Amino acid sequence: MKPNIVLIMVDQMRGDCLGVNGNEFIETPNLDMMATEGYNFENAYTAVPSCIASRASILTGMSQKSHGRVGYEDGVSWNYENTIASEFSKAGYHTQCIGKMHVYPERNLCGFHNIMLHDGYLHFARNKEGKASTQIEQCDDYLKWFREKKGHNVDLIDIGLDCNSWVSRPWGYEENLHPTNWVVNESIDFLRRKDPSKPFFLKMSFVRPHSPLDPPKFYFDMYKDEDLPEPLMGDWANKEDEENRGKDINCVKGIINKKALKRAKAAYYGSITHIDHQIGRFLIALSEYGELNNTIFLFVSDHGDMMGDHNWFRKGIPYEGSSRVPFFIYDPGNLLKGKKGKVFDEVLELRDIMPTLLDFAHISIPDSVEGLSLKNLIEERNSTWRDYIHGEHSFGEDSNHYIVTKRDKFLWFSQRGEEQYFDLENDPKELTNLIDSEEYKERIDYLRKILIKELEGREEGYTDGNRLLKGHPVSTLKHIR
């Protein structure tokens, strides 16, 4: 039988928030084991660092220019012909998604045989004046289950935390009722009810560590008194907050109270460790069903979280905290016959997930897919690889584009004409902006020309073919509206 495939996806987890990736403060024993015994990719990025566009890349294997989502916009239909789930389904796999999809309409199967949905608190879905199909009671299976357990009056907002806020506190109910546990509950139940005559493709999609920052008390307490590192602060960062943006509990940039920021990081780390332990629980269950050694796992996040670095928060911007993600493959049965424990430095993007997993299952990759399969890299066959990724995000005054390679990164904020350049080999924390350095002028010109070429013909008018122009940012390109 073909291998089972499990795609484990978390939301808003930074690439540096794994012990195996050099973080000495966080405890991620199961994830560290999986990455250490598998194949770890240290230069994985999202081309559009927010939820919807990142998930479109994973779902379709396309670049953002092709799937059409270059910023954050709810309510735009998902009508892609070829998806990762549809290809597995057509190839005879039993397909299931549990947790976050963040598509529209919310109950769009997108090729899965079944979905058990929890997108978290979405302002768009909570619009009480909207269509019934977009109201959360109609499209959140976790909330239905939660109310069956605790009564019809309980809600996702009971502990008073917004879904984008830096405010944090422990989960207000029993640990086993947390959404993170629910994803694993339902994933284990899928092992019971799956078709035993077919291999399966399971997407386990956690809402955390995305806000609300509400891990169960045990996990919050693990970190709340620890001396966690201060946020990174580049020489280019705005050290002032004249407009008091940090007073906004949902701020994207600004300066917030140090105690509150320390609690936020404790809750963020706690949420990740909680996910780690629950993934450990799933591994135990999969072993009990006798399927562990016939299963290949891919672990990834949709994007990261600035968590106060350079006085920025959340995501949507090109800096490492927002754009770089954890990405590893775990193959306990050594079905891939590769050199396990290897760390790769090739530049990856989320569009590479679909062709990689289809390749693992010996399924044909549709012509619409623009990502690259990692199978040849893992098998150490001679293969060419991309030199860079073009990333972007429409974001009002902070709309941005970037070119990132394994050695450096060029950034352009289109609406204010600001450029930055970081030598990631020598400055992986992006502490020194070298845009005015004569030493790097030739390299910067080269990367700028790459960006101009990437943006040629785009409807926003970002270039005339010779230079970068301010343009008119949009969140969704016309061809998918």
From Swiss-Prot:
GO terms for cellular component: cytoplasm. Ca(2+) binds at D11, Q12, C51, D302, H303. Its EC number is 3.1.6.1. InterPro entries: Alkaline_phosphatase_core_sf (IPR017850), Sulfatase_CS (IPR024607), Sulfatase_N (IPR000917). The conversion to 3-oxoalanine (also known as C-formylglycine, FGly), of a serine or cysteine residue in prokaryotes and of a cysteine residue in eukaryotes, is critical for catalytic activity. This conversion can be carried out in vitro by AnSME under anaerobic conditions. Has sulfatase activity toward para-nitrophenyl sulfate, which is increased in presence of calcium ion. This is Arylsulfatase. It comes from Clostridium perfringens (strain ATCC 13124 / DSM 756 / JCM 1290 / NCIMB 6125 / NCTC 8237 / Type A). The lineage of its organism: Bacteria, Bacillati, Bacillota, Clostridia, Eubacteriales.
